[in-house]
Each structure stands twice: as structure tokens, then as C-alpha cells.
Amino acid sequence: TNGVPGKCTKPGGCSTYCRDTTGTMGLCKNSKCYCNKY
């Protein structure tokens, strides 16, 4: 999966994005947001 840029600039931005869009946990790697199922 491709990381989403711009979601890791704010604390919790990636987590909120992933939860709202896919219902998954968010992980920031290399300044990009990745959504992972748990």
C-alpha cells in the first residue's frame, strides 16, 4: 500500500485519517501515513 503524504505533520493526524477512512490503525513511516489492519 502507498503511504499518504501530509497526514503525519500533526499529532494523531495519521491515526485519525486511517480510523475515519478504513477503520484501521495508522502508522507513520518516512513522513507518510500507512493504514494497517489489526
UniProtKB/Swiss-Prot annotation:
<keyword id="KW-0800">Toxin</keyword>
<feature type="disulfide bond">
    <location>
        <begin position="8"/>
        <end position="28"/>
    </location>
</feature>
<dbReference type="GO" id="GO:0005576">
    <property type="term" value="C:extracellular region"/>
</dbReference>
<keyword id="KW-0528">Neurotoxin</keyword>
<keyword id="KW-1015">Disulfide bond</keyword>
<dbReference type="GO" id="GO:0015459">
    <property type="term" value="F:potassium channel regulator activity"/>
</dbReference>
<dbReference type="GO" id="GO:0090729">
    <property type="term" value="F:toxin activity"/>
</dbReference>
<keyword id="KW-0632">Potassium channel impairing toxin</keyword>
<comment type="function">
    <text>A probable toxin that has no activity on the tested mammalian voltage-gated potassium channels (when tested at 1 uM) and is not toxic to mice. It resembles alpha toxins that block voltage-gated potassium channels.</text>
</comment>
<keyword id="KW-0872">Ion channel impairing toxin</keyword>
<protein>
    <recommendedName>
        <fullName>Toxin Bot33</fullName>
    </recommendedName>
</protein>
<comment type="similarity">
    <text>Belongs to the short scorpion toxin superfamily. Potassium channel inhibitor family.</text>
</comment>
<keyword id="KW-0964">Secreted</keyword>
<dbReference type="InterPro" id="IPR036574">
    <property type="entry name" value="Scorpion_toxin-like_sf"/>
</dbReference>
<feature type="disulfide bond">
    <location>
        <begin position="14"/>
        <end position="33"/>
    </location>
</feature>
<feature type="disulfide bond">
    <location>
        <begin position="18"/>
        <end position="35"/>
    </location>
</feature>
